[in-house]
Every structure is written in C-alpha cells, then in structure tokens.
Amino acid sequence: MNSLIEKIFADFKVDNKNIPVSFLKYNGQETTYITYQSIDNSGTLNADDEILGYIEYYDFDIFSKGNYLKIVREVKKIMKANGFMWQPSMSSGDMFEDDTGYYHKTLCFKKERMEE
C-alpha cells in the first residue's frame, strides 16, 4: 500500500507549493509536510477458513506553521479519487503543538483490500 500512497502523492502541491509526504517521519527542511502510517487492518471477509479481503486504515498527519485547511481539502480529494474513504470519527480535531509551534491535523482513511 505504501507504494500506492507514494505514487498518489508524488509531486503533491497545494497553491503551487510542493508538500512533502513521507512514511512515518519527515526529515526535510519544509515547514509544511505530511506523514502517514498504517494503523489497523480489520473488517475481514472470510470464506472457507480463508481471508478474502479486509479493510486497511491509514492516518495522514498534516503539520504546518500556518493555515492548513486547503491541504486538508486537497488530501481528502486526492484520497477519494483513489478509492479511499475518509473516516471522520477516527480523525483528530484541530491541534497546536506548543513545543514545536506546528498546527497539526490527523486524517484517517480506509481502503478495502482483496487478498490475491
């Protein structure tokens, strides 16, 4: 799934500004960036004692020193266009981290997967 997410977010831009998207941790210099991680696999579909499919959940953490609302909208849009469904009940409220000075928002998405 990570390769799909990396492909989806290759050259991700909001207002003509590149927004880096990294797995788990961002090590660059940009002050606006997104990290993502798998948080759960559940909701399995079983038949004849075999798993046929499941639901995979991913968190996307948006970090910014300024207004991030357009980024939130664009992430939701690109994820929906690629078959992911936003999970509002598993996403965070708006946060501000006093120790870093970053605004922070977590968006959770799910995608159904079928075993091959």
Name each model-derived stretch.
Residues L52-G66, Y103-R113:
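Oligomerization/assembly interface segments of phage tail-like spikes and tubes
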Residues R73-E116:
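Acidic-leaning, charged glycine-interspersed low-complexity segments
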Residues G43-L45, E56-D59, A81-M85, K110:
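Short, surface-exposed linear patches
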Residues N67-R73:
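Short, conserved charged micro-motifs
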